[in-house]
């Protein structure tokens, strides 16, 4: 990663003065979908941000971990390399068929400061309409303009951004930042190593693990970069999760008919033992966005089924000597969370007043 030359034909990006940017056609598509775009970075007001702005509930992460501090309206969901990814996952609700499998070089990308300033400007634009919203108070919008939390997890794979350690450090240095979450598909363990080595680990690192073996991984994740050793890279990332000095989570997206079969649960437990994460989040696939062209509503689980699967996983983990407990659940998001008691960390980043 990091060579400054084009190795693939870019469909949704172009070069301007040597820097990669989202192309005009892709920009129009993203703007129509209510994204903010700056260069190669993307930002969005997610469902839970909009809900919190208009008096509704916040994201399950507030309930589970107390982040974003103050509520979901104070979250910045950002993709530092929007529409670039190493995988084309079958369940992705982003337009992954519109992603370029390209690893940008250091000299081809914007600086962290450019990303932060551009993303915050675009986010202010997206928030501006809420000043006149009938169900949103001016105070809520003003709070939203002072974000406490950054979720580096939007369109694209963030660990493909070669200046990610600098970006996380710069975000942490902002006066209102309380937490930074990073979500990765695990294909770039070398970036996780860099984050650790350069003292730039996020507050909480998520790894998406949606298959317990190599064969199923290739069917679900469909890696297009590092295809020959993609599964081995995920395993290396899991090994790093067991060592790095920050909070770690493995999220499992459950897709009926693909990875929910009972005979796969012991395999999941075995692979999870490599990462030994602080938390495990089994969550139902949701038939939203562009995933509707690949999967159906029948592939979704009811929350009761997610809970039942989680309890079976809990037993399989304990059978292998791992001491996890059922920590919490959120039926609205069809998600549960298991907590590691041997590798214990307090669940709260900052305990909410009304968790």
Where are these regions (language model features)?
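Short cysteine clusters
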Residues: 78, 85, 89-92
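N-terminal [4Fe-4S]-dependent radical SAM core
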Residues: 4-82, 96-115, 119-144
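Conserved AdoMet/S-adenosylmethionine-binding subsite of the radical SAM
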Residues: 136-296, 301-304, 308
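Short, acidic Gly/Pro/Ser/Thr-rich loop/turn segments
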Residues: 85-88, 99, 214, 287, ...
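Auxiliary Fe-S-binding modules of radical SAM enzymes
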Residues: 1-66, 242-245, 256-355
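Surface-exposed beta-strand-to-loop junctions
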Residues: 90-91, 95-101, 289-291
